[in-house]
Design a protein with these regions (language model features):
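Class I SAM-dependent methyltransferase SAM/SAH-binding core
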Residues: 24, 29-78
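A short glycine-rich, Lys/Arg-flanked "PGG" loop and its adjoining helix->strand segment in the class I
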Residues: 101-113
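Short alpha-helix
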Residues: 134-149
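Conserved beta-strand signature within the Rossmann-like core of class I S-adenosyl-L-methionine
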Residues: 114-122
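A short SAM/SAH-binding and catalytic strip from SAM-dependent methyltransferases
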Residues: 86-100
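A short acidic, Gly/Pro-enriched loop at the edge of an enzyme's catalytic core
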Residues: 76-88
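Conserved alpha-helix/loop element of class I SAM-dependent methyltransferases that forms part
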Residues: 1-21, 36
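Core SAM-dependent methyltransferase catalytic element
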Residues: 159-175
């Protein structure tokens, strides 16, 4: 996927693009969606790009408008020193989380009360051992976040995927 495709996948009117924001990209990899989010946020915003792959993090740099701070950490098991985030982006990383309800409860402590989740995932519930061990198709995602107290779980866009001839979807989630 190219940067412009990633931007189109997460672009939404539900995202505050006028005010400075602080976000975390959990499981950011080499930063494709970190850069996509940076392209949408207001100048002066900050994104914490978090991944356990230190080699991938070395490829991520700040953009002209948005500060990107990399953090080498296991976002699933480590307690992150993050507070008052405006949002969390999880692009192709939620499917590595086995206990999603417990994880959502944990990361909620990183967020402001009026915050946003942006999720990009494969629209399947069928696991693939190494790459998608704990999938969350959109209907499953709705159920998980609804049970965690979130009221708005909206599918934004879809993009074809080479994985299993299916689709990747994006969703915005708010309380």
């Amino acid at each position: 996927m190219e940067l412009q495709e990633a931007i189109a996948l997460i672009k939404t009117d539900g995202l505050n693009t006028k005010d400075k924001q602080t976000w975390a990209d959990l499981g950011c990899g080499q930063g494709l969606f970190t850069y996509a989010l940076a392209g949408l946020l207001a100048k002066g915003s900050t994104i914490y790009a978090i991944d356990e792959n230190s080699s991938a993090l070395k490829k991520i740099n700040s953009t002209g408008n948005v500060i990107i701070k990399t953090l080498h950490s296991d976002f699933i098991n480590d307690d992150l020193d993050l507070v008052n985030l405006d949002g969390i982006l999880m692009a192709n990383s939620l499917h590595y989380v086995k206990d999603k309800p417990a994880f959502i409860k944990k990361v909620r402590s990183y967020l402001k009360p009026e915050s946003t989740f942006l999720v990009v995932e494969y629209d399947t519930d069928k696991p693939v051992a190494t790459w998608v061990p704990y999938p969350a198709g959109f209907q499953s995602l709705k159920k998980i976040f609804s049970e965690a107290g979130y009221s708005t779980i909206k599918k934004l866009h879809e993009h074809s995927s080479i994985f299993n001839s299916g689709n990747i979807y994006s969703a915005i989630i708010t309380r």
